[in-house]
Amino acid sequence: MAFSLSENPRLLNCLDSDIPALSTCSNADTFSRMNTMLGNSLDLSGVCTTPTAKCKRDPFNGRPDSDLSAVRSRMLFLSGGQDSSRGLPDVSNWGLGLQSLSLSDWERPWSSHDSDPSAQTNTASLHGILGTPSHLSNRLPSYSEPSIGATDFLERFPGMARLNSQSFLDSHSISPVDSETSGFSSGSDHLSDLLSSLRISPSVPFLMSSMQRDPLKLALGSRLDHSSSPLTPPPSATSSGGLSHRWPGASIWPNWDLMKTPESPFSIEREAWLHRQAASINEATFTWSGQLPPRHYQNPIYSCKVFLGGVPWDITEAGLINTFKCYGPLSVEWPGKDGKHPRCPPKGNMPKGYVYLVFESDKSVRALLQDCTEDLLHPEGYSEYYFKMSSRRMRCKDAQVIPWVISDSNYVSCPSQRLDPRNTVFVGALHGMLNAEALASIMNDLFGGVVYAGIDTDKHKYPIGSGRVTFNNQRSYLKAVSAAFVEIKTPKFTKKVQIDPYLEDAICQSCSREPGPFFCRDKTCFKYYCRSCWHRQHSMDILSNHRPLMRNQKKRDVN
């Protein structure tokens, strides 16, 4: 393919930033004792050794070293099926703090691992086996049985090769009770005291700081359940399943695995929604520069909806209607999220600086344009219209009026050519000045073979920012799909658009039984899938970085 999917380094390198990863200064002596008991086999270079004034007492004074060894064994030998690595860890997840020990598999503490299907059912039985008192059961983390062999374990944790862990691997126990470092029973109160004295989990600001740098994560954060801690994974994050390892690692997104729940029934939908926003964070693989084709209209028919930009900041809906009602009955649509336009701005929020005016007839739009100041842009032949309006605190402000000529929604270069949807691409993030003819000209210059271009519109026949282009050959189609992102530069604007295969209602091409709403655009797949077939196909590591496409569920008028 002509473009590459690269991993966002900001999240993976967050541990190398200037932000203190862990508050381990008060625990330096603890880690030093642990390292001594383990034969100096750990790398403590990432642990702060500066003494702090707040640490007044040593929780380990008076305790024999043998009483601490089993706890250290538990903290180091985490189960490969531990579910806490699924989503965002809880503040009380003490095991996460051991990433400062530079263990190889904890370089990416939130990477996804295959879970043990029996993880949930074994929790209660493990408490019984270990003899944990009931009053401690809600204070200690629960782990599933390790299901990996010694070879796999050492491959995943090469830093543990020197440790005497054979008894742990053979016994399938969390604590190696038969080892030389085991000095007390699993139910001892020393364990509770030791864990309560440690503060080795990263703080909330540290975990959230890297996410606050990314607008996608901020948008996603608003979807979290406000009744729970922002660092608490959703309930389904700890559920088990053989298809839990989905889309980790190589992704153009800033590690969506941090916040999503793989087993959620709508995880694929969230991936598809994120892909629709990909133009904002990806580099263009093709660039087109030039003048847009000139426009010539004779008795144009306008959409009854117009864009009004640069309105006074203190304008009200009543003021807008009072200003424009002389041209005919109208309604006002304020900008909203996800393409929804409420009838009035939300209470407590300032207007966005632009609105949409919806008249009942295109004759009202004609009359409005006649009262506007017209600036003709050469050589495109595109006219800009400005209307002088006032508010209580602003006088004679020029607001831009952007109409839409309905004939600009479609362009056909060869009327006799049969349009094949299999050679059609979807183009998103279009600029408002691009009509169908200009889009066809740009795509033909880049890829060739364009026979049709269309602009998607709403119920008022006003463009919604996307379009379609049909080619007369598969070579041009595949070249456009592989390009994925194209930057368009004109004297008036610069815009990066996104190109994807045009999707239709289709049957799953894997099982041929269920509807296939999910499409994989990677060239190794390039087919429609139902939900179960998508999970089955992309549970393989080699295909796990593929991203789904879905048809936009918003209603639109496809001309």
Curated annotation (Swiss-Prot):
One of its GO terms (biological process) is regulation of mRNA 3'-end processing. GO terms for cellular component: cytoplasm; neuron projection; nucleus; synapse. Keywords: Cytoplasm, Metal-binding, mRNA processing, Repeat, RNA-binding, Translation regulation, Zinc. Zn(2+) 1 binds at C508, C511, C530, C533. Residues 304-401, 423-504 form the RRM domain. Residues 223-244 are annotated as: Disordered. PANTHER family: CYTOPLASMIC POLYADENYLATION ELEMENT BINDING PROTEIN CPEB (PTHR12566), CYTOPLASMIC POLYADENYLATION ELEMENT-BINDING PROTEIN 1 (PTHR12566:SF9). Sequence-specific RNA-binding protein that regulates mRNA cytoplasmic polyadenylation and translation initiation during oocyte maturation and early development. Binds to the cytoplasmic polyadenylation element (CPE), an uridine-rich sequence element (consensus sequence 5'-UUUUUAU-3') within the mRNA 3'-UTR. This is Cytoplasmic polyadenylation element-binding protein 1.
